């Protein structure tokens, strides 16, 4: 009990309080001046290396700052609503994981935009493959889902193509002509 009393007495000692107030004021003043004068710490070397590794990717990040993910569903397979939902979920999760690994900054931007996802129709597998090829040439993340074939459709059927997340301008260049599902 005596040690608690002595500790409390030391903490409320005028000299201790003055020291604490001085340190707090100094930190606030330093922080305020740093932000006012624009003196921010430089990027770490790992961040700088990552930026140079992704060079073109960083330069094509959406000019408007908008990002989205597109899920392209084949309509010729006549999948039920639940099947389409499951296949789209597989594509979205796969695309998310790829982007998290390859382009974490793109993923952050997409999340900041509200994680928009749009589902569109493709008439057949050939269209899906053409879209995949075009998206890859633009450097977009792609995720082609093949069904296991345990329920409604043949094993190995390519059901959904996930594109993105990525800059709206690039994704629209690939899928802008497709109709909503």
UniProtKB/Swiss-Prot annotation:
Alphabetically ordered keywords of this record: Hydrolase, Isopeptide bond, Membrane, Mitochondrion, Mitochondrion outer membrane, Transmembrane, Transmembrane helix, Ubl conjugation
Principal location: mitochondrion
Keyword Transmembrane: yes
Catalytic activity: an N-acyl-L-alpha-aminoacyl-tRNA + H2O = an N-acyl-L-amino acid + a tRNA + H(+)
Compartments (UniProt record): Mitochondrion outer membrane
Membrane topology label: Single-pass membrane protein
Enzyme class, spelled out: hydrolase
GO cellular component: cytosol; mitochondrial outer membrane; mitochondrion
SUPFAM superfamilies: Peptidyl-tRNA hydrolase II
EC number: 3.1.1.29
Entry comment on modification after translation: Ubiquitinated by PRKN during mitophagy, leading to its degradation and enhancement of mitophagy. Deubiquitinated by USP30.
Cross-link type Glycyl lysine isopeptide (Lys-Gly) (interchain with G-Cter in ubiquitin), residue numbers: 78, 83, 97, 108, 117, 179
GO MF annotation: an example: peptidyl-tRNA hydrolase activity
GO BP terms in the entry: negative regulation of anoikis; negative regulation of gene expression; positive regulation of anoikis
One of the Pfam families matching this protein, by short name: PTH2
NCBIfam families with a match to the protein in the record: arch_pth2 (TIGR00283), PRK04322.1 (NF003314)
Quaternary assembly: Monomer.
Biological role stated in the UniProt entry: Peptidyl-tRNA hydrolase which releases tRNAs from the ribosome during protein synthesis. Promotes caspase-independent apoptosis by regulating the function of two transcriptional regulators, AES and TLE1.
Family: Belongs to the PTH2 family.
Name by which UniProt lists this protein: Peptidyl-tRNA hydrolase 2, mitochondrial
Originating species: Mus musculus (Mouse)
Gene symbol of the encoding locus: Ptrh2
């Amino acid at each position: 009990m005596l040690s608690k009393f002595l500790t409390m007495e030391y903490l409320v000692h005028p000299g201790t309080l003055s020291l604490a107030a001085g340190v707090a004021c100094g930190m606030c003043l330093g922080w305020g001046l740093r932000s006012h004068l624009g003196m921010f710490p430089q990027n770490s070397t790992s961040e700088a290396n990552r930026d140079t590794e992704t060079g073109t990717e960083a330069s094509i990040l959406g000019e408007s700052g908008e990002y989205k993910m597109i899920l392209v569903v084949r309509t010729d397979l006549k999948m039920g609503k639940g099947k389409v939902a499951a296949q789209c979920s597989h594509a979205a999760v796969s695309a998310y994981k790829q982007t998290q690994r390859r382009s974490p900054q793109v993923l952050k931007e997409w999340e900041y935009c509200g994680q928009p996802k749009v589902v569109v129709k493709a008439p057949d597998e050939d269209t899906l493959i053409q879209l995949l090829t075009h998206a890859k040439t633009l450097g977009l993340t792609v995720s082609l889902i093949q069904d296991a074939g345990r329920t409604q459709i043949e094993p190995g059927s390519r059901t959904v193509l996930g594109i993105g997340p990525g800059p709206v301008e690039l994704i629209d260049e690939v899928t802008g002509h497709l109709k909503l599902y």
